[in-house]
């Protein structure tokens, strides 16, 4: 088989990962920036800086470790900012970014976060990943109601390609879905224009109130709801990399770019699973190339940061969510198998899975964190009971 034939799924996995990441949460970023009082031009500059920051970090880490290390912004953190920044000046918002990213960098330097991550059993990490991805898998079929032609054709294409040419199943699904959506008039091209926007430096301001009321919660949510699931995802996918160096790189870059609107650069979870799955490459040692491709697409998204919102508006949501769900089915099934394969850990794993899948938010912290907490409590109690 020609080497180029191996590159198609790899490049596509990187593209789908970036597409899903932006489609699922770019609007939240705009809401958070608007809440801080940023202008449309400044918001576009934030998207540019975020794309470049995530692209550089993904390329550097994946190349250095020869592992699929995908970075992302903190979607839970962005959601918290969108609801917390009203009444806070733009300068104070930048101060919050610098404060939180400095704390994240400190966690990497001290090794505190790495020590916490070593306490998570592999079965619970896999269960957490399956719980996080479950909703994406359900979306692949939920859109059959209301968008039967589009989603039905994509599912049919995926099934046929999976049976005949599994390496190209997502390629075929993307193309078939794109053709059907275009023919049905669901692709609204007049909403998309290419534009280049330079990020704008914003001088920070630090106030005790904003740092304590927004900065600290944002730091905790980012670490618990984004970085922790990100490392658990890598561990569940067979890439147990040391946490501290990755936190230092991502936290350091985020701190450097904070004055330009980069509120966080974290280890990705959901989108990383696309690049870490067998669909990206049959050889686990070659899947880092999918992350390299994703890094390239991140840079493109950054260069054309002002066009991202228009692109997301041009594509039908049903097409994006069905594509993402089908791309993640293999990861979901593999994670469930790893989570439930050990009978002694099965109860703790199912508690982790169901808590995570529930989507519950407590104290502003998402369900992935609470899934690991409750599952960890069950794991400790049941282990002690068995040894008694």
Residue ranges and their predicted role:
Residues 38-39, 167, 239-240, 263, ...:
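Short coil/loop linkers at secondary-structure junctions
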Residues 23-24, 149, 225, 267, ...:
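Residue-level signal for transmembrane alpha-helical positions in Major Facilitator Superfamily
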Residues 2-4, 10-29, 48-129, 241-329:
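Helix-loop-helix junctions within the multi-pass membrane cores of secondary transporters/permeases
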Residues 1-44, 171-244:
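Helix-loop-helix hairpins and the membrane-proximal interhelical loops
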Residues 64-66, 111, 196, 201, ...:
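Residue-level signal for pocket-adjacent positions within structured domains
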Residues 34, 118, 235, 258, ...:
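Short polybasic/polar patches that bind polyanions
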Residues 29-33, 57, 78-82, 138, ...:
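Predominant activation on well-ordered alpha-helical scaffold segments within soluble catalytic domains
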Residues 86-192, 293-388:
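Membrane-embedded alpha-helical modules
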């Amino acid at each position: 088989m020609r080497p180029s034939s191996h590159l198609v799924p790899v490049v596509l996995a990187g593209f789908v990962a970036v597409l899903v990441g932006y489609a699922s949460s770019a609007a939240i970023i705009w809401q958070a920036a608007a809440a801080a009082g940023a202008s449309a031009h400044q918001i576009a500059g934030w998207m540019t800086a975020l794309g470049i920051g995530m692209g550089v970090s993904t390329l550097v880490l994946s190349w250095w470790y020869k592992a699929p290390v995908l970075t992302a912004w903190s979607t839970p953190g962005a959601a918290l900012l969108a609801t917390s920044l009203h009444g806070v000046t733009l300068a104070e918002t930048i101060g919050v970014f610098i404060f939180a990213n400095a704390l994240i960098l400190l966690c990497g330097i001290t090794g505190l976060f790495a020590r916490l991550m070593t306490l998570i059993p592999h079965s619970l990490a896999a269960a957490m990943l399956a719980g996080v991805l479950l909703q994406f898998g359900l979306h692949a079929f939920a859109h059959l109601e209301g968008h039967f032609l589009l989603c039905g054709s994509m599912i049919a294409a995926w099934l046929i390609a999976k049976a005949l040419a599994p390496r190209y199943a997502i390629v075929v699904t993307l193309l078939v879905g794109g053709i059907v959506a275009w023919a049905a008039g669901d692709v609204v091209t007049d909403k998309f224009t290419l534009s280049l926007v330079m990020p704008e430096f914003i001088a920070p301001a630090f106030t005790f109130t904003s740092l304590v009321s927004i900065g600290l919660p944002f730091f905790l949510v980012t670490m618990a709801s984004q970085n922790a699931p990100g490392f658990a995802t890598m561990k569940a996918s067979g890439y147990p990399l040391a946490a501290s160096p990755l936190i230092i790189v991502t936290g350091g870059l985020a701190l450097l770019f904070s004055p330009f609107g980069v509120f966080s650069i974290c280890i990705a979870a959901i989108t990383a699973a696309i690049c870490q799955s067998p669909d990206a490459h049959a050889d686990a040692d070659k899947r880092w190339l999918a992350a390299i491709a994703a890094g390239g697409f991140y840079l493109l998204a950054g260069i054309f940061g002002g066009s991202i919102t228009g692109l997301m508006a041009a594509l039908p949501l049903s097409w994006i969510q069905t594509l993402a769900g089908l791309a993640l089915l293999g990861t979901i099934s593999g994670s469930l198998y790893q989570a439930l394969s050990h009978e002694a850990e099965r109860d703790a794993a199912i508690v982790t899975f169901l808590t995570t899948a529930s989507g519950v938010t407590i104290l502003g912290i998402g369900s992935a964190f609470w899934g690991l907490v409750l599952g960890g409590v069950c794991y400790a109690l049941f282990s002690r009971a068995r040894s008694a």
